Regions:
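Conserved acetyl-CoA-binding loop-helix of GNAT-fold acetyltransferases
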Residues: 81-86, 90-104
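A short helix-loop-beta-strand connector motif used in the catalytic cores of GNAT acetyltransferases and
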Residues: 44-56, 65
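Acyl-donor-binding surface of acyltransferase catalytic domains
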Residues: 1-8, 98-104
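Conserved beta-strand in the GNAT
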Residues: 56, 62-70, 78-83
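Short, low-complexity Ser/Thr-rich regulatory SLiMs
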Residues: 18, 71-73, 86
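Short amphipathic alpha-helix that is part of the acyltransferase structural core
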Residues: 2-41
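A generic structural signal for beta-strand entry/edge sites
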Residues: 52, 74-76
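Alpha-helical elements of Rossmann-like donor-binding domains used by nucleotide-donor carbohydrate transfer enzymes
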Residues: 24-28, 62, 96, 100
């Protein structure tokens, strides 16, 4: 799933997370909440979760968003841990992540 950012003329893409996304994702997650974030504690579990998918959104190749999809049953899914880098907000990053998750 992609979304064109007309102002910056850059494409937002959503894909499955990779281990090498960890550092960049945790960096923007640390800037998301004033009191810290739990993503650093669940990253490895979510990355290996066979009952769902960990998605990363990128802008100009740089991770700027995160969402975890967990399949609760064949008909029901749960989306959790949605995060968007504060510097990339208001560009449709979460929309791209949710749309990609809905197609899985």
């Amino acid at each position: 799933m992609t979304n064109r950012d007309a102002a910056a003329d850059e494409t937002i893409e959503a894909r499955l997370a990779r281990e090498d996304d960890r550092e960049a994702v945790l960096a923007f997650c640390a800037r998301t909440w004033d009191d810290g974030d739990y993503i650093q504690y669940v990253w490895e579990d979510w990355l290996r979760d066979s009952s769902g998918a960990l998605l990363v959104a990128t802008l100009a190749g740089r991770p700027v968003g995160l969402a975890h999809l967990r399949m609760m049953s064949p008909e029901e899914a749960w989306i959790e841990g949605v995060r968007v880098d504060p510097e990339a907000r208001r560009r449709g990053v979460a929309r791209v992540l949710i749309s990609r998750a809905a197609r899985l």
